[in-house]
Amino acid sequence: MGRSFEVRKSSMAKTQGAKIKVYSKYGKEIYMCAKNGGPDPDMNLSLKHLISKAKKDQVPTHIIDKAIDKANGGGGEDYQHARYEGFAPGGASVIVDCLTDNGNRTFQDVRQCFVKTGAKIGSPGTSSHMFDHQAVFQFKGEDEEAVLEALMMQDVDVTDIELEDGVITVFAPNTEFFKVKTALAAEYPDLVVDVEEITFVPQNPMEITGEDAEKFQKFLDLLDDCDDVQQVYHNAELED
């Protein structure tokens, strides 16, 4: 990857309103995952991973259970995945993933985020080719070579592995997610994994400074206010 993986998640919600947005996004995603793959986490590995991720982000159990019960009961909303790509202020590449029950509304909402900040929304494929769709695992450690050897012994396809400041980051094709997860658990039963997700890793990070950085942050804030937006991926590196 040429550099250490940077987790670009927003800081944990500090206000009640922001927490509600986080809960809503997880609730919608868990509902769709359970509806499409079944409500039993032991039979639906994607759901099992999503529940684990939600708990790490401090989503209350009753929110998770409610979403699964809703999916198990049938009916309810029929959400569809929608993806929008383009270039954010300063020219950074961006991918916006949504879950929506009204595609026209969601497109208009996302489009306004681009328009209001001078960003440019494009057609499918506009910016996604500038990212690698990867499974990423991050945990404390000092011997990345031993981890790599252990994964290779389990016949795991590893794209890259990095060590920086006592943190090991493993990259693998997105299709290898559960294979990596299983192999790490088998080789290191007591390992605490801080990050385990499928994400879009930028191939070439872009430094955004000055006025462009301010506009870029406004762009992210506007997207965060859109109820249908689930994830935003970008290659921007902002000044501290």
Curated annotation (Swiss-Prot):
The keyword Cytoplasm applies. GO terms for molecular function: DNA binding. One of its GO terms (cellular component) is cytosol. GO terms for biological process: regulation of DNA-templated transcription. It comes from the Bacteria. It is found in: Cytoplasm. Disulfide bonds: none annotated. Keywords: Cytoplasm, DNA-binding, Transcription, Transcription regulation. The keyword Cytoplasm applies. It holds the Pfam family Transcrip_reg. Its main location: cytoplasm. Belongs to the TACO1 family. HAMAP family: Transcrip_reg_TACO1. This is Probable transcriptional regulatory protein VSAL_II0141. It comes from Aliivibrio salmonicida (strain LFI1238) (Vibrio salmonicida (strain LFI1238)).
